[in-house]
Amino acid sequence: MLSSTTIATKKPVLLGGEALANAVASISFPFSEVVQSQRSFIAAAWALRRHGIICLRGAASNQDLTSIRDEIDNLLGNIESNDLSNLQDIAYLNLPNHRVLKGYNNFRDADRPVINYRVKRPDGRTGSDAGMIDIFHPERLSSNLGKRIQDCLHEKLIQRLLLVSSLNQMKVKCRNLYLNRGVLDTRSYHCDGRSLKFKSFVYISDVNELNDGPYCYVKGSHRRRGIWWRSALFNKKNQLGPFEFSQLQGTEAISLFAKAGDMVLSSQKGAHCGHPQHPKAKRTVLVNMYQR
């Protein structure tokens, strides 16, 4: 399959200024109110059903965020200094010059954490996310991380919210920690398949501008079948991957700027992507995937 960026695809208009502020405000809810108020809880669930994405402000505590950041910084420091003796006993290390596992399913089903460094594709295709470190099952790296991550994810509450929103019981399938370090080669707008699937993203670091590499989303695209079929026909004709949203002309996308501790929750059937970063930018996000 070819990359959607190698031929003429149609991208959405990325909102900015007051238009972006208004669009994001309509899907934003204080986490404390969603917890305490049934009215706010229902409003958040309904917004997720309608728009495919919401932002819960202030979902994680500063203490949990600081502890996660400190432990991950120490872990990366050990890898960069080639001090791997302890890590190799508790995790699979997929380093740029030494790969021990291949394939998403093997990462997801691994019996221990997988620290996967994404690298440029050998065939030159775009969308590699080179420069990203994707840690599968980070909660298993230590008991402290396990507790802190569980505290940040609020899985029981999110499962109840997803039940009200989608009328389906969703289960946790995989937890990840995304560490983006100057990622320039991001995948264009796409969906994660056509089955019902949600992800929560807890921002461990602030994402204040496009250079930070925010999560971008076309509101309502999870329900707009016309957009999907238009892209599907184009993809088949041009040998693109089946899940690329290649024909998004006439649509608008939002970039989710957020503070550390905010949680974004989105339907992965919708058109989404990560914005390319500045070469020196850093972004850390805790991710949870929910499926039936």
What are these regions (language model features)?
Residues 168-170, 190-193, 204-213, 220-222:
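Active-site region of the double-stranded beta-helix
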